[in-house]
Amino acid sequence: WSSDVCSSDLTGLDREIGDADHGLNMHRGFSKVVEKLPSIADKDIGFILKNTGMVLLSSVGGASGPLFGTFFIRAAQVTQAHQSLTLEELYQMIRDGAEGVISRGKAEPGDKTMCDVWLPVVESLRQSCEQKLSVQAALEAASQQAEVAAQSTITMQARKGRASYLGERSIGHQDPGATSVMFMMQMLAQASRE
């Protein structure tokens, strides 16, 4: 989200069915996370994730701050005292974070929300665990699933969030929150390659 491309893409999507601030909010929040990282980089994964969540809660406006903040705070609980993660631990981390988002947002599949990406990503990671894939292969598969899932929101009518006020006019537009999750999964997959 620190890239201008992500920020611009998300703002453009949000302009169509929201209030045109999602990309700016995500950019601001993750820029604050990047500023904080040097002071916590030597800590365990759980500590870093919890601090990321707290920064997002305090710096990202709209519903996205609480939702992404919740994701990272819940994900932190599974990763306390970890310096690295197995695929099973990564799956548990993302599953728990996604469950926190879904619980907080009270979203269901088909509501045209980030839930429509989180659930397929979690399922993809579960299947990767069963297949005993490497972390990199699992993240590649989850990233591909996230892209398909985000694109699937185009045909949905929004039932949650600001876009729900548009009713049928929300059909034909990709959900910005779902797209944020897709970007996050793409960035995780890219990081696993480096």
Which residues fall in each region the model found?
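Phosphate-handling active-site elements
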Residues: 37-48, 77-93, 109, 130-133, ...
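A structural-propensity feature for long, helix-poor, extended segments
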Residues: 82-129
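A short glycine/serine-rich beta->alpha loop
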Residues: 13-18, 39-43, 53-63, 103-108, ...
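Short, small-residue-biased leader/transition segments that mark boundaries at the very start
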Residues: 1-7
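Hydrophobic/aromatic-rich structural module bridging two neighboring secondary-structure elements via a short loop
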Residues: 43-82
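C-terminal binding/interaction regions
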Residues: 110-116, 129-188
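Active-site-proximal helix-loop elements at catalytic-domain edges
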Residues: 11-40, 117-148
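Conserved phosphate/anionic-ligand binding catalytic regions in large, soluble enzymes, centered on
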Residues: 16-26, 59-72, 169-188
